[in-house]
C-alpha cells in the first residue's frame, strides 16, 4: 500500500463521514447542540493536546515526517484536527441515535437513595482505582506506558461523568452502546488503514505488541473505545442537565424566554443541573409529563411518532400542548356523561384557563387545584398542571378560541355557510396551529412574528378542511354531524347526513363535495406553506412533514374516480416517504420540475 499522508487520511476517511452526519442532522440541529459541540470540542482539544504531546515526546507513537503539513509542539497539525473531528463525529452520531426519545423520561426522581449510591459509588471507585494503578505504571520506555497513559487520561473523566449521569446512562443501554461501538469500530478500521499505509506507527517499546486484529494494537483499540465512551457519557450528561434546566426554568427566564444568556452562564447552569441527583427533583412534575405523553401516545400514534423529528425541547412542549387539547376534547366528547355535565366541565376548563392567564409570568403560578380535582379526571388534572408550564409562551385568545370550538360541538350548532365553516375551523384548528407556532418560536428565541402566526392559522384551516372532506361519512355515522356548509346541500341531504346516512347521497355526490372542500384547502395552502420557511430551521422539517402528510390525504381523494372511501388514508410506505422527503425539504410538488427543485436544495445546503 502506498504511503497515505495524514491530510489525505482526513480527506478520505474522517471528513466525508463527518459531512454526512452533519447533513443528516441538519434539519434537527438546535442551539442546545451548538453548546454541546462547542463545550466538548474545547475540552477535547485542550486536554488531548497536552496528553498527546506528552506521549509523542516519549515516543509512544510517531508519524511519517513527510506525511504531515506542520508540527506544533511534538504533534502534527492533522492530529489536532483529529481531536476536533473525532469529537464531532462521535457526538453527532450519539445525537442522532439518542434524539428519538425524550431525555426527560430517563430521569427518575422516585429512585431510592440506596440504589443511587450503589450504582454511582461502585463504578466510580473502580475507575479511580484503575486510574491510580495506571498512573504508577506509566513508565517511559516500558511496554505498559501507552496503555497506562490511556487509562489515567480517560478513567478519571469517566468517573466524574458516571457520578453525575450514571443512572441516566444505564437507563439508555441500547442507545449508549450503539453510540460507542459503531464510531469505535469505524475509527479502529480507519486506524488499521493509516498504520498499514505508514501514516503513523505505534512503538513496540512502549506498548505490549499485542494485536486485536492485524495492524490494530490493543492500545489503539482501547484508546478509541475509551475516548468514545467519554464522549458518549458526556453527551448523556449534557442531555440530562439540559432536560432538567428546561423543566426548571427560573421565573426570570419565564418572564422573558427570548433573553439570551452567555456561554459561561449556560455552562454554569449545566454544572448545577449535572450535580443535582434525581431525588432532589419534583416527582409530580415528571409524573404529569409522563401522563401527558401517555395521553398523546394513546390518542394519536401518528402525531406521537411524527413529533420525534422536532428538537427535544419543542417536542416536549408540543406534547404537553397536544395532551391539553386532547384531554379537554375528551371531556366534551365523553358520551357517558350528560350534555349538561360536559358543559359544566367545559365551563370549569374555561375558568382554569382564565385563572392561569390572569397571573403574571414573572411570578410563580398559583392554582387552587382542589377546585378542579373534585370535578375532573386525574389524567386531565395532570395535563392541566403540565400545561401551566406554557403560560409564558402562549396567549389566552387561541386557548379560549379552542374552547369555543368545543362549545360549538356541544351545542350541535350547524355549519350553515362558508363563513360558519371558516369560523368553526378557526376555533378547532387555527387556534391549535397558532399555539403550536408560538411554542416553536419561543424555543429558538425568535419574535412571535404576526405574519408567521397568520400563516399557521391558515394552515390550520387547510388541515381541518381536509379532515372534514375525508370524514363526511365517518362524522355522519359516528357523530350524526354534518360539518359541510348546509348551503352546499339540499335540505334532504343535510337531514340524511345528520341521521347517519351520508352514504345515501351516493359516491359521486360525496366525491364532489369532498373535492370542493379540498379545492378550498389547496387554494389556502399556497399561501399558508410559505410560513414554514420562516420558522426556526430545526423545526421546519417536522412542521413540513406533518402538514404535507396530512394534506396528501386530499391527493388520495382526488385520485378516486368512482368511489368515495369511508376514510381516505395514505399507505404507510407513502406516508413515510413524504415525511422523510419533507424533513429534508426534498418533497417534490407536482408543479415544479424535479431537477430544478433538487438543484435549489443542493445550492441551499452549501450556502447555508
Curated annotation (Swiss-Prot):
It catalyses: all-trans-lycopene = gamma-carotene; gamma-carotene = all-trans-beta-carotene; 2 (2E,6E,10E)-geranylgeranyl diphosphate = 15-cis-phytoene + 2 diphosphate. Its EC number is 5.5.1.19, 2.5.1.32. Residues 247-608 are annotated as: Phytoene synthase. One of its GO terms (biological process) is carotene biosynthetic process. Pathway: Carotenoid biosynthesis; beta-carotene biosynthesis; Carotenoid biosynthesis; phytoene biosynthesis; all-trans-phytoene from geranylgeranyl diphosphate: step 1/1. Residues 1-240 are annotated as: Lycopene beta-cyclase. GO terms for molecular function: 15-cis-phytoene synthase activity; geranylgeranyl diphosphate synthase activity; intramolecular lyase activity; lycopene beta cyclase activity; squalene synthase [NAD(P)H] activity. The chain crosses the membrane at residues 3-23, 37-56, 80-97, 117-137, 150-170, 175-195, 218-238. GO terms for cellular component: membrane. It is a multi-pass membrane protein. It is found in: Membrane. The keyword Transmembrane helix applies. Beta-carotene is a popular additive for butter, ice cream, orange juice and candies in the food industry. B.trispora is one of the microorganisms of choice for industrial production of this molecule. PANTHER family: BIFUNCTIONAL LYCOPENE CYCLASE/PHYTOENE SYNTHASE. Bifunctional enzyme that catalyzes the reactions from geranylgeranyl diphosphate to phytoene (phytoene synthase) and lycopene to beta-carotene via the intermediate gamma-carotene (lycopene cyclase). This is Bifunctional lycopene cyclase/phytoene synthase. It comes from Blakeslea trispora (Choanephora trispora).
Amino acid at each position: 500500500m502506498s504511503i497515505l499522508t495524514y491530510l489525505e487520511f482526513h480527506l478520505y476517511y474522517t471528513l466525508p463521514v463527518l459531512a454526512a452526519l452533519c447533513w443528516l442532522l441538519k434539519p434537527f440541529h438546535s442551539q442546545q447542540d451548538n453548546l454541546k459541540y462547542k463545550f466538548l470540542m474545547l475540552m477535547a482539544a485542550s486536554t488531548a493536546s497536552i496528553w498527546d504531546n506528552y506521549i509523542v515526546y516519549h515516543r509512544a507513537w510517531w508519524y511519517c515526517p513527510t506525511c504531515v503539513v506542520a508540527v506544533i509542539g511534538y504533534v502534527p497539525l492533522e492530529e489536532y484536527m483529529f481531536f476536533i473531528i473525532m469529537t464531532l463525529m462521535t457526538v453527532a452520531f450519539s445525537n442522532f441515535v439518542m434524539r428519538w426519545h425524550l431525555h426527560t423520561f430517563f430521569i427518575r426522581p422516585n429512585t431510592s437513595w440506596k440504589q443511587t449510591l450503589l450504582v454511582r459509588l461502585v463504578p466510580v471507585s473502580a475507575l479511580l482505582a484503575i486510574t491510580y494503578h495506571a498512573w504508577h505504571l506509566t513508565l517511559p520506555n516500558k511496554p505498559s506506558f501507552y496503555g497506562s497513559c490511556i487509562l489515567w487520561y480517560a478513567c478519571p473523566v469517566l468517573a466524574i461523568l458516571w457520578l453525575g449521569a450514571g443512572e441516566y446512562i444505564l437507563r439508555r443501554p441500547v442507545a449508549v452502546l450503539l453510540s460507542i461501538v459503531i464510531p469505535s469500530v469505524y475509527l479502529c478500521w480507519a486506524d488499521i488503514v493509516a498504520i498499514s499505509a505508514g501514516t503513523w506507527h505505534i512503538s513496540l517499546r512502549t506498548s505490549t505488541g499485542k494485536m486485536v486484529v492485524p495492524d490494530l494494537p490493543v492500545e489503539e483499540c482501547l484508546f478509541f473505545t475509551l475516548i468514545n465512551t467519554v464522549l458518549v457519557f458526556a453527551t448523556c450528561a449534557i442531555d440530562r442537565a439540559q432536560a432538567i434546566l428546561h423543566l426548571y426554568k427560573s421565573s426570570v427566564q419565564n418572564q422573558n424566554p427570548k433573553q439570551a444568556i452567555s456561554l459561561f452562564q449556560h455552562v454554569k447552569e449545566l454544572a448545577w443541573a449535572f450535580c443535582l441527583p434525581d431525588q432532589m427533583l419534583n416527582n409530580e412534575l415528571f409524573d404529569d409529563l409522563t401522563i401527558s405523553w401517555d395521553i398523546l401516545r394513546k390518542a394519536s400514534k401518528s402525531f406521537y411518532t411524527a413529533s420525534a423529528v422536532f428538537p427535544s425541547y419543542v417536542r416536549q412542549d408540543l406534547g404537553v400542548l397536544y395532551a391539553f387539547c386532547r384531554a379537554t376534547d375528551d371531556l366534551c366528547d365523553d358520551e357517558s356523561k350528560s350534555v349538561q355535565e360536559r358543559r359544566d366541565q367545559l365551563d370549569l376548563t374555561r375558568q382554569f384557563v382564565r385563572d392561569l392567564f390572569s397571573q403574571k409570568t414573572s411570578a410563580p403560578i398559583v392554582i387552587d387545584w382542589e377546585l378542579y380535582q373534585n370535578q375532573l379526571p386525574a389524567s386531565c388534572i395532570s395535563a392541566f398542571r403540565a400545561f401551566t408550564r406554557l403560560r409564558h409562551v402562549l396567549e389566552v385568545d387561541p386557548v379560549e378560541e379552542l374552547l369555543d370550538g368545543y362549545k360549538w360541538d356541544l351545542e350541535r350548532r350547524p355549519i350553515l355557510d362558508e363563513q360558519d365553516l371558516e369560523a368553526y375551523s378557526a376555533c378547532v384548528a387555527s387556534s391549535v396551529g397558532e399555539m403550536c407556532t408560538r411554542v416553536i418560536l419561543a424555543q429558538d428565541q425568535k419574535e412571535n412574528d404576526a405574519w408567521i402566526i397568520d400563516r399557521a392559522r391558515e394552515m390550520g384551516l387547510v388541515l381541518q378542511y381536509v379532515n372534514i372532506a375525508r370524514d363526511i361519512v365517518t362524522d355522519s355515522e359516528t357523530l350524526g354531524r354534518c360539518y359541510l356548509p348546509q348551503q352546499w346541500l339540499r335540505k334532504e341531504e343535510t337531514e340524511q347526513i345528520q341521521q347517519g346516512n351520508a352514504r345515501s347521497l351516493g359516491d359521486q355526490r360525496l366525491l364532489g363535495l369532498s373535492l370542493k372542500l379540498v379545492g378550498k384547502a389547496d387554494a389556502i395552502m399556497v399561501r399558508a406553506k410559505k410560513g414554514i420557511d420562516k420558522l426556526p430551521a430545526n423545526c421546519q422539517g417536522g412542521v413540513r412533514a406533518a402538514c404535507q402528510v396530512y394534506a396528501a390525504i386530499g391527493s388520495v381523494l382526488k385520485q378516486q374516480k368512482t368511489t368515495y372511501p369511508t376514510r381516505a388514508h395514505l399507505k404507510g410506505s407513502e406516508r413515510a416517504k413524504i415525511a422523510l422527503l419533507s424533513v429534508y425539504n426534498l418533497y417534490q410538488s407536482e408543479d415544479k420540475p424535479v431537477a430544478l427543485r433538487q438543484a435549489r436544495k443542493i445550492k441551499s445546503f452549501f450556502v447555508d
